[in-house]
């Protein structure tokens, strides 16, 4: 799963939903909506995806040099505590000690607009739980996990294979 392709697919699906909603609201065909509101739709989508496009570009650049461990978790300043995120934290810290500079650690909190990346990577149906941890290498989402702590050994299975 290439991160750029996931972003493109998500953006196109979102565009389809916007056109469909506008067609329903204006009692018009989707083709009519696409031609009448083309500029407004494009501006809306561009604004909606601006932040996440920058994050994807940054992760793509970083992951060309070395693997990236992306960690999307609850903001530690939030009043609500994510117990799963807290149980996962020592595993991520252990990876920092084990791998040091050989991998890049990239953290996003759920209070940031960058958190939209979660939905770009995890496009399947079902409940979306924090944390999300993903290994990204050369622009590809090699593996991602959601809603549970990930054992150090699970990460190592993928990271060691990449770093060989």
Residue ranges and their predicted role:
Residues 1-68, 160-164:
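N-terminal leader/targeting and pre-domain segments
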Residues 70-81, 86-117:
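Thiol-based oxidoreductase modules, predominantly thioredoxin-like and allied folds used
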Residues 55-57, 92, 118-121:
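A generic local structural motif
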Residues 61-62, 84, 125:
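Residue-level marker of regulatory loop/turn positions in helix-turn-helix DNA-binding domains and
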Residues 5, 42, 75, 138-142:
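A near-ubiquitous, low-amplitude feature marking generic local secondary-structure context
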Residues 2-5, 86, 146-147, 154:
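A composition-driven signal for long, intrinsically disordered, charge-rich low-complexity tracts
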Residues 97-143, 147-164:
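Thioredoxin-like thiol-disulfide oxidoreductase module
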Residues 69-70, 133:
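Hydrophobic beta-strand anchors of alpha/beta hydrolase catalytic cores
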